[in-house]
Amino acid sequence: MKIIGLYLKFSFLLSLILTTSRITAQNLPDGIQYKITGRLLMDGGVYLKNPNNFGNGTEFNDLRIGVKATYQNWGMKLEMGYAGNKVAIKDAFATYSYKNSSIQIGQFYEPFSLDMICSTFDLRFNQSPGAVLALTNSRRMGVAYSYRTQYYYLCGGFFTDNDLSNLKNASQGYAIDGRLVYRPLYEQAKLIHIGLAAIHRTPDGTLPEDENRNTFTYKSPGVSTIDNRTLIQADVDHAASQFKIGTELLIYYHKFFLQGEYIRAHVKREKGFENYTAQGAYLQCSWLLLGQNYLYDEEVACPGRPEGKALELCARFNYLSLNDAGIKGGTQKDLSFGLNYYINKHIAVKLNYSYFIPGSHIKEIESTNFSVVQIGRAHV
């Protein structure tokens, strides 16, 4: 019954967007442009070395429908998504742009982490690295200002700790974000991107009976959500504030692609409790067996997919540690390889192999290495 209910909700939202678009199309003032957007990410996974009895299977990793509209200097985006048996509001924001500047307000990603802010279709692998999943945030409600030139990108914002699909009965915390990117080399098929981002955040002040008040949680499902267990998790209670810093490196050279990040989260805790630090990093590279070069999204300073039809070979190493200050969140290392075929700018087939090395205080499973093969098809 739950699945039927979710299906009916998503069908209603889909019909509402499509009906609205038809009505709007008949009454559009001159200069307004809009388009219906969609995304379909289907994944399947098989665990090859499987001492922990992980379940093989398939899933809709992401299913979306939405609309984009532009009018003069204004832009708007509204997108609904279905994943993990939940219907949720994804992006919901308006943007005003003037020359090289823009102001964005609504619900969207905070300006932190290359792998988090880029489109899921543009990811090299079926899933972001554990360091990114654990140490970054999803979309939040807020306002941000950005400025860009050929060689620089700057973004700063103010966000509440709230999203439209997970409203909290709480006095919401807030976050102040900043991101700076320098591109000493930026020309056709060649790019050097060096970035630095930081966030200062306060925890939610929830109701007195809520055990999770003043708590920051960091967690990761490992390398796949086919078996959706949380393998590494740290709940840092008695938190006063949090400071995150992230460094970025992105290099393009014709068929070659290199991307890496280091992320560190420091939690200042109340008197009598030891401060906590979590950290993680990843490094990935790609080579185009077919195709010529990679795209780059200058508006948000993040990597894109290969241009046109392409065949891509990828490799990635990820490390994450959530053990500190007596909190045993766990550690993980994993090595992944991928082969991606981009049929066109809308459709791609991705084959991934990941080898997971659990460290101390891993959750849910024994400290035994395992591997998984995933295949996914993306339609945007």
Report the location of each language-model feature.
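Short, P/G- and charge-enriched loop/turn segments at secondary-structure junctions
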Residues: Q26, G130-V132, T230-V236
